[in-house]
C-alpha cells in the first residue's frame, strides 16, 4: 500500500529498490531554505545491512502490511531462538538478529510478538518492560545531590544501566527493553 514518506514510522516494513526493509529510525528535517525531507535509517531484511535514505515529505513509498502473532520464548539454539505457538504448540526457529539490541532481555516463557509479512518473520517485539536483578552497583558519591544523580549498575543479563542512588546490588528493578533505562523498583 502506497503512503506518503512523512507517515513512515519505526518498526514498519517498506519495499524500496525491489527489496524489503524494516524502518529503524525516522526523522523529519526542515532546513532553513527549501522543503522539508525525511531521513530514514532502515535494515535490509534479507542481508541485515543498514542504510539511510532521504525522501521529500510528498514522495510516496510502498508500505507492506504486517501481521502480528504471539509466541512464547522457549530457549536459545546457537544463533537462533526457539519460539512456541501457544495455540498449536508448534515450535518455530527464528534468527537471533531479528531482536537486535533487545536480545539480552529474553526470559524463559516470555510472550513475544512476531511481525510477519506474507508469512515470513521480519521482526520481533519484546514486552516494553522486564524485571531484572542488580548484580553490581557503584557506591553513592556523597555531595552529588544538587542535581538528579544516577549511578551505573550491572543487571543480571549483563546489560549496564543507570539507576538512582538508593538502588543497591541484589535488588530487583523494572527496566525498559527498548533502551535499558530504569523505570522503578520492582514491587513484591
Curated annotation (Swiss-Prot):
Pfam families in the cross-refs: EFP, EFP_N, Elong-fact-P_C
UniProt KW Ribonucleoprotein keyword: no
Keyword entries, A-Z: Cytoplasm, Elongation factor, Protein biosynthesis
DNA-binding in keyword set: no
Cell location: Cytoplasm
Superkingdom classification of source: Bacteria
GO cellular component: cytoplasm
InterPro entries linked: Elong-fact-P_C, NA-bd_OB-fold, Rib_uL2_dom2, Transl_elong_fac_P/YeiP, Transl_elong_KOW-like, Transl_elong_P/YeiP_cen, Transl_elong_P/YeiP_CS, Transl_elongation_fac_P
GO molecular function, one term: translation elongation factor activity
HAMAP family found in the cross-reference section: EF_P (MF_00141)
Family statement: Belongs to the elongation factor P family.
Function: Involved in peptide bond synthesis. Stimulates efficient translation and peptide-bond synthesis on native or reconstituted 70S ribosomes in vitro. Probably functions indirectly by altering the affinity of the ribosome for aminoacyl-tRNA, thus increasing their reactivity as acceptors for peptidyl transferase.
Protein name: Elongation factor P
Organism: Gluconacetobacter diazotrophicus (strain ATCC 49037 / DSM 5601 / CCUG 37298 / CIP 103539 / LMG 7603 / PAl5)
Gene name in the database record: efp
Amino acid at each position: 500500500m502506497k503512503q506518503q514518506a512523512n507517515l513512515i514510522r519505526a518498526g514498519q516494513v517498506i519495499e524500496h529498490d525491489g527489496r524489503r526493509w524494516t524502518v529503524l529510525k525516522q526523522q523529519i528535517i526542515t532546513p532553513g531554505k527549501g522543503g522539508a525531507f525525511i531521513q530514514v535509517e532502515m535494515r535490509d531484511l534479507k542481508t541485515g545491512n543498514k542504510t539511510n535514505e532521504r525522501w521529500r515529505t510528498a514522495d510516496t513509498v510502498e508500505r507492506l502490511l504486517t501481521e502480528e502473532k504471539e509466541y512464547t520464548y522457549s530457549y536459545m539454539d546457537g544463533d537462533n531462538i526457539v519460539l512456541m505457538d501457544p495455540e498449536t504448540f508448534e515450535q518455530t526457529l527464528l534468527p537471533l538478529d531479528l531482536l537486535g539490541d533487545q536480545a539480552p532481555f529474553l526470559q524463559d516463557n516470555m510472550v513475544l510478538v512476531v511481525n510477519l509479512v506474507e508469512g515470513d518473520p521480519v521482526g520481533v517485539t519484546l514486552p516494553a518492560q522486564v524485571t531484572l536483578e542488580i548484580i553490581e552497583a557503584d557506591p553513592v558519591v556523597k555531595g552529588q545531590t544538587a542535581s538528579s544523580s544516577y549511578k551505573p549498575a550491572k543487571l543480571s543479563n549483563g546489560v549496564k544501566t543507570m539507576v538512582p542512588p538508593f538502588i543497591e546490588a541484589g535488588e530487583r528493578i523494572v527496566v525498559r527493553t527498548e533502551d535499558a533505562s530504569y523505570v522503578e523498583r520492582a514491587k513484591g
